[in-house]
């Protein structure tokens, strides 16, 4: 990638002026957030933040486009995998509707009156159930959530059979009124967007011991079904990698190898108390980062030189390409060892000794800008982690309302003849 080949890019920007240790701490906090399951919405906020930092650092836009191009193939590969592994779009039940069901614990679905959505990952999971013993009139329908005891249910043939059973319970309600009330309450379901998947109906289960009816929605899927969930999952994972690439680009493009070595050494300073050679470790990392651009540039030169001699790296079978690759690997290894030897000789000539204490020519001071940046990022980090632990973020991928299609219409449910 171009940013690695060019390495450090001097600019007069806010990001360049930050203390090296400050940039490393912010980088580590963002990496932690990327690997924490914070949900698609919060991760998108982090992505926008990293993009904002990238451009206020005054880095060339081609670096940004290069990073996106480099993960396009990964996105397509993940989309292909998710196409066949996540063919189930699932159903949604909104928190507003959950709040109308008195027996549900709404604490995990709402936080500070934020409207959230509960994603039913498996369409063969129960959405809600109701007790027929409380069905004395249309105003006393007692709906509530029932968790993981579907094995005890006995199949009922369909919605009409369910309405007939309730009407024969001696409650004085006709089948049509019960069916009408049932349909009204079951318009709480949303079907996630998909191509080739259609709502097919409910399997209605009855437990004679507890007098509970469980409603399980199911779908009719075409062979080519592609769900929006599969697309989001592919983008979700790709976005994680893109965030790390972009911020690594910002870190290496706004900090020289000397600054990175200084920042790493200061960040790992407590390890000196247990006799770990932090300065050697920091110097090793700084040298490795410094030589990545050089080696990539050398590899490009070798590829061009070999191509000018008629060597084809793109065409041919697998074995042919592997033999051609040796023409790149062997010179690269030779160049790497040669550079390492020259660097070691140069450092010895300048009197470098890893066991000796070294002074620093450049003095980096913590300013109020560093303190403010650390405070804001750390506060943001704590809030996101807190909301994640509380379960107050959008569940699973954090699917917002615009990903939902309309309610399953009444006529579709009314016309169903579902067999158990």
Curated annotation (Swiss-Prot):
<dbReference type="Pfam" id="PF02361">
    <property type="entry name" value="CbiQ"/>
</dbReference>
<feature type="transmembrane region" description="Helical">
    <location>
        <begin position="276"/>
        <end position="296"/>
    </location>
</feature>
<keyword id="KW-0472">Membrane</keyword>
<feature type="transmembrane region" description="Helical">
    <location>
        <begin position="317"/>
        <end position="337"/>
    </location>
</feature>
<keyword id="KW-0812">Transmembrane</keyword>
<feature type="transmembrane region" description="Helical">
    <location>
        <begin position="369"/>
        <end position="389"/>
    </location>
</feature>
<comment type="similarity">
    <text>Belongs to the CbiQ family.</text>
</comment>
<dbReference type="InterPro" id="IPR003339">
    <property type="entry name" value="ABC/ECF_trnsptr_transmembrane"/>
</dbReference>
<protein>
    <recommendedName>
        <fullName>Uncharacterized protein MG181</fullName>
    </recommendedName>
</protein>
<keyword id="KW-1133">Transmembrane helix</keyword>
<dbReference type="GO" id="GO:0005886">
    <property type="term" value="C:plasma membrane"/>
</dbReference>
<feature type="transmembrane region" description="Helical">
    <location>
        <begin position="66"/>
        <end position="86"/>
    </location>
</feature>
<feature type="transmembrane region" description="Helical">
    <location>
        <begin position="26"/>
        <end position="46"/>
    </location>
</feature>
<feature type="transmembrane region" description="Helical">
    <location>
        <begin position="231"/>
        <end position="251"/>
    </location>
</feature>
<keyword id="KW-1003">Cell membrane</keyword>
């Amino acid at each position: 990638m171009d940013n690695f080949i060019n390495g450090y890019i001097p600019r007069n920007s806010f990001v360049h002026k930050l203390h090296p240790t400050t940039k490393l701490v912010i980088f580590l906090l963002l990496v932690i957030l990327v690997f924490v399951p914070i949900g698609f919405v919060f991760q998108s906020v982090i992505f926008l933040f990293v993009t904002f930092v990238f451009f206020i650092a005054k880095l060339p836009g081609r670096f940004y486009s290069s990073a996106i191009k480099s993960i396009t193939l990964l996105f397509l590969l993940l989309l292909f995998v998710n196409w066949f592994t996540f063919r189930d779009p699932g159903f949604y039940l909104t928190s507003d509707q959950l709040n109308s069901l008195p027996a549900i614990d709404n604490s995990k679905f709402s936080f500070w009156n934020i409207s959230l959505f509960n994603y039913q990952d498996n369409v063969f999971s129960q959405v809600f159930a109701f007790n027929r013993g409380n069905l004395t009139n249309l105003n006393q329908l007692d709906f509530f959530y029932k968790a993981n005891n579907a094995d005890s249910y006995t199949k009922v043939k369909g919605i009409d059979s369910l309405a007939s059973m309730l009407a024969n319970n001696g409650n004085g309600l006709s089948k049509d009124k019960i069916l009408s009330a049932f349909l009204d309450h079951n318009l709480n379901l949303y079907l996630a967007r998909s191509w080739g998947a259609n709502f097919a109906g409910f399997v209605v289960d009855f437990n004679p011991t507890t007098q509970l009816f469980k409603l399980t929605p199911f779908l009719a899927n075409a062979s080519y079904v592609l769900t929006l969930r599969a697309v989001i999952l592919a983008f979700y994972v790709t976005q994680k990698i893109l965030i790390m690439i972009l911020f690594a680009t910002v870190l290496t493009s706004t900090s020289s190898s000397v600054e990175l070595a200084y920042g790493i050494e200061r960040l790992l300073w407590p390890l000196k108390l247990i006799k770990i050679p932090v300065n050697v470790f920091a110097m090793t990392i700084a040298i490795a980062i410094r030589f990545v651009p050089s080696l990539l540039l050398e590899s490009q030169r070798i590829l061009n030189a070999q191509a000018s001699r008629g060597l084809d790296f793109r065409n041919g079978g697998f074995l042919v390409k592997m033999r051609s690759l040796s023409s790149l690997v062997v010179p690269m290894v030779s160049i790497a060892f040669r550079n390492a030897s020259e660097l070691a000789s140069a450092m010895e000539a300048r009197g470098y000794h890893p066991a000796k204490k070294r002074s620093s020519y450049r003095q980096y001071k913590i300013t109020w800008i560093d303190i403010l940046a650390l405070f804001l990022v750390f506060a943001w980090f704590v809030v996101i982690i807190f909301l994640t632990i509380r379960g107050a973020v959008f569940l699973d991928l954090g699917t917002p309302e615009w990903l939902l299609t309309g309610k399953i219409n009444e006529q579709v449910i009314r016309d169903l003849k579902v067999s158990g």
